[in-house]
């Protein structure tokens, strides 16, 4: 069955004389309301709606975080401290964590079961087998310092956000002194998950299984290229010294005024 043809009706145009009247008519304003320019300075007109996040009274711990972040931008940061702002790239970090996860320390439950089985075997009068300590990730600043000084550590990973930083400040220089590969990695919490803790300042690998030797060698090569071999460059690189827009504008204003005065002389 053929569809019905829809006929659209055209609306008649507005006559010319009426159109002219509508264009001529202007909005009638009340003369009692005077038009004046607004002044948004302090203590003057009501401010327009805007983002007032900057003026929020934050809790004390957040306020300290914000102040610390701003101070680190403003003040000149020595290279020894500034090196902790440059962390290992994400791809290499993923490879490092993939390797570390194979050598996580045993959980509390696993340790309990192992000791229970050992106690039962001893009670049954079976001969006790002396087994070698399995290769695991070592953590704790004192432990890692000792491993580096005895040249037993094969790879050291240091967290970039340790607070206070003085805890791990000596580790990069110590690792370079004893030719131990080291890397600064993002997140003390990420390192903490490896050793089943909330956070940890640094971790170290002492030895790995034969099947993981090649993975460790590749990782050590990447780490050395990024940190140990770039030591001279890192040593010269200061941080901070970035001023706010307000300070920059003030400085520019003073410089322009000085240039104007010199021009007059």
UniProtKB/Swiss-Prot annotation:
InterPro entries: eL8/uL1-like, Ribosomal_eL30-like_sf, Ribosomal_eL8-like_CS, Ribosomal_eL8/eL30/eS12/Gad45, Ribosomal_eL8/Nhp2, Ribosomal_eL8_euk
Gene Ontology CC: cytosolic large ribosomal subunit
The keyword Ribonucleoprotein appears for this protein: yes
GO biological process: maturation of LSU-rRNA
Alphabetical UniProt keywords: Calmodulin-binding, Ribonucleoprotein, Ribosomal protein
Recorded GO MF terms: calmodulin binding; RNA binding
Protein's UniProt keywords contain Ribonucleoprotein: yes
Family from the record: Belongs to the eukaryotic ribosomal protein eL8 family.
Subunit structure: Interacts with cmd-1 in the presence of Ca(2+).
Name by which UniProt lists this protein: Large ribosomal subunit protein eL8
The species this protein was found in: Caenorhabditis elegans
Upper taxonomic lineage: Eukaryota, Metazoa, Ecdysozoa, Nematoda, Chromadorea
């Amino acid at each position: 069955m053929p569809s019905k043809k829809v006929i659209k009706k055209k609306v008649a145009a507005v006559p010319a004389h009426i159109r002219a009247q509508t264009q001529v008519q202007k909005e009638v304003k009340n003369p009692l309301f005077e038009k004046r320019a607004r002044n948004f300075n302090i203590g003057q007109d009501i401010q327009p709606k805007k983002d007032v996040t900057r003026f929020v009274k934050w809790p004390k711990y957040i306020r300290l975080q914000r102040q610390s972040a701003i101070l680190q931008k403003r003040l000149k940061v020595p290279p020894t401290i500034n090196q902790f702002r440059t962390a290992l790239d994400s791809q290499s970090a993923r490879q490092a964590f993939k390797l570390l996860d194979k050598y996580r320390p045993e959980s509390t439950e696993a340790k309990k079961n192992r000791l229970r089985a050992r106690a039962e075997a001893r009670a049954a009068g079976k001969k006790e087998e002396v087994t070698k300590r399995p290769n695991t990730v070592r953590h704790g600043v004192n432990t890692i310092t000792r491993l580096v000084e005895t040249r037993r550590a094969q790879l050291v990973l240091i967290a970039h956000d340790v607070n206070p930083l003085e805890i791990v400040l000596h580790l990069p220089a110590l690792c370079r002194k004893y030719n131990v590969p080291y890397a600064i990695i993002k997140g003390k919490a990420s390192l903490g998950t490896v050793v089943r803790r909330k956070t940890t300042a640094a971790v170290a690998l002492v030895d790995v299984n034969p099947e993981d030797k090649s993975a460790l060698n590749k990782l050590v090569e990447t780490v050395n290229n990024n940190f140990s071999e770039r030591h001279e460059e890192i040593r010269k690189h200061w941080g901070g010294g970035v001023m706010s827009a307000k300070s920059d504008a003030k400085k520019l204003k003073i410089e322009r005024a000085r240039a104007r005065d010199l021009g007059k002389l």
